[in-house]
């Protein structure tokens, strides 16, 4: 495999973080945690192609980030050719499933 083919084989990910008043400090995403997440992604062989933050009073029970922000992430996924979304907050199984279905990529 050539170096160019290796680069193309990397997972392209959009990173998503939520900062909500109702979450604890450990559960909230911030610049530092998003940088750490990008570093972990790179260590795992992926590449960050975009980052999205959402500020809300509380996580959306269905999508975690809200319908409007999910639409924004979907648009970014398409524009950047991402094949996955990595969320810096814990998701419930149903939130992960709904986001994956709405975004059309692995979450």
Residue ranges and their predicted role:
Residues 1-107:
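N-terminal accessory targeting/assembly segments
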